[in-house]
Design a protein with these regions (language model features):
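Non-globular, low-confidence helical/coil segments that flank catalytic cores
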Residues: 1-230
Length: 230
């Protein structure tokens, strides 16, 4: 079960298998007193009867992706946190105090829950090491997660991309080619002009493309020229 959550200008996707739950990003912080974690995600998870998260994945450090993470960590037991955050980031420290296992998103990591396959395609260990030296922009480190499984007698796939940009898209195409093909694509970077290159879209060839962006947002997401490529 995959739920793309309306958090306004930000990203959050809930993935549930028969016995496991993964939350990919936590949306924005709306103000000092309010964020998507407390206002949207915790009420949603509780309404669905979810009492814990097996994995919280934070694609990168931008506030529209991690703004609700503190509230989620404090409000619900979390087993593991995977992210591209630098090791000094406050959310990793918070997770540590709460007894959450912390690990980096690293390309090549795979696991299976209840017959559903998960694989991280990005970032590389080298990119994460460069980020620790302040040599990498957060968007370029976005955790890219591929999900695949069978239900209804058919194979289904989805690709979650964070704020991935064209250069990283090109590397994925060069490395994976047509195996990137996915039925559902979370449109990179909210439909920004920085992303959704033609070669990447040809490789992924999504049947459904989902843009997470706030109504009349100040960034102009999604860009009309990007939508035209879909």
């Amino acid at each position: 079960d995959m739920t793309v959550i309306d958090v306004g200008q930000g990203t959050s996707v809930l993935l549930r298998t028969a016995r496991h739950t993964l939350l990919y990003d936590t949306g924005p912080q709306y103000s000092r007193e309010s964020d998507a974690g407390g206002r949207v995600l915790l009420p949603l998870l509780r309404s669905l009867g979810e009492e814990r998260l097996d994995l919280l994945m934070l694609s990168h450090r931008d506030s529209d992706h991690v703004g609700g993470a503190g509230a989620v960590l404090r409000g619900l037991p979390v087993t593991r946190l995977a992210s591209s955050l630098e090791t000094s980031h406050g959310l990793l420290a918070l997770a540590g105090t709460l007894g959450v296992d912390r690990e980096p998103c690293v390309a090549g990591r795979r696991w299976t829950w209840d017959g559903v396959r998960f694989e991280l395609l990005h970032p590389t260990a080298e990119a994460l090491a460069a980020a620790e030296l302040g040599k990498t922009r957060p968007n370029t480190l976005s955790c890219v997660l591929r999900i695949g499984g069978r239900w209804g007698g058919q194979a289904h796939t989805a690709l979650l991309t964070g704020d991935l940009e064209r250069e990283q898209e090109a590397r994925l195409v060069a490395q994976h080619g047509g195996s990137l093909a996915s039925e559902v694509l979370l449109v990179p970077h909210h439909g920004s002009k920085t992303s959704s290159s033609a070669a990447f879209l040809d490789a992924v060839a999504p049947r459904v493309a989902v843009v997470q962006a706030g109504y009349r947002n100040r960034f102009g997401h999604p860009a009309m020229e990007v939508l035209a490529r879909y």
